[in-house]
UniProtKB/Swiss-Prot annotation:
Highest taxon above the source species: Bacteria
Intracellular or extracellular location(s): Cytoplasm
PANTHER family: TRANSLATION INITIATION FACTOR IF-3, TRANSLATION INITIATION FACTOR IF-3, MITOCHONDRIAL
Single GO BP term: ribosome disassembly
Function: IF-3 binds to the 30S ribosomal subunit and shifts the equilibrium between 70S ribosomes and their 50S and 30S subunits in favor of the free subunits, thus enhancing the availability of 30S subunits on which protein synthesis initiation begins.
Keyword terms of this UniProt record: Cytoplasm, Initiation factor, Protein biosynthesis
Organism: Microcystis aeruginosa (strain NIES-843 / IAM M-2473)
One function term, GO molecular function aspect: translation initiation factor activity
Gene3D superfamilies: Translation initiation factor 3 (IF-3), C-terminal domain, Translation initiation factor 3 (IF-3), N-terminal domain
Ranges in coiled-coil conformation: none
Name of protein: Translation initiation factor IF-3
NCBIfam families: infC (TIGR00168)
Taxon lineage: Bacteria, Bacillati, Cyanobacteriota, Cyanophyceae, Oscillatoriophycideae
Amino acid sequence: MIDKRRTTRDLPQINERIRFPEIRVIDSDGSQLGIITPAEALRVAEEKELDLVLVSETASPPVCRIMDYGKYKFEQEKKAREAKKKQHTADIKEVKMRYKIDEHDYNVRVNQAQRFLKAGDKVKATITFRGREIQHSNLAEELLARMAKDLQDVAEVQQAPKKEGRNMMMMLSPKK
């Protein structure tokens, strides 16, 4: 069975939970009240019907602020949500083709790669060889170089064309 009671370490340090001999206190309007005892700071906070919240315990002495804790907690959660929204992980999208690709098909692949790059993703351009086609790796290298040239306005080559088994690949990343 899981113990549902939270330890005091997990709880936020507010009001009576602040256990330091002296703290630096900042008022709700941003002015400093100086270095006082937690009991005195708590009395000031209660007079204003607000909470005493520990902002930085690493400072010497620890810094506390008089504020509405519910509002503070809401703002912190809101900031975390915004940060999560803005966070974009660059995925690696793959564009596969053969070295004997037709012109229209090549243009479709270039447009596809361009879309991926504009979305902020990296692109792995892969050319697959079958059977004896591997003898024509120079043509595949030329095709990848052409693709890099066609995409130079939106991408930069992160990894030059190189052979890996029966494939030749090149990595492109979006320009900053």
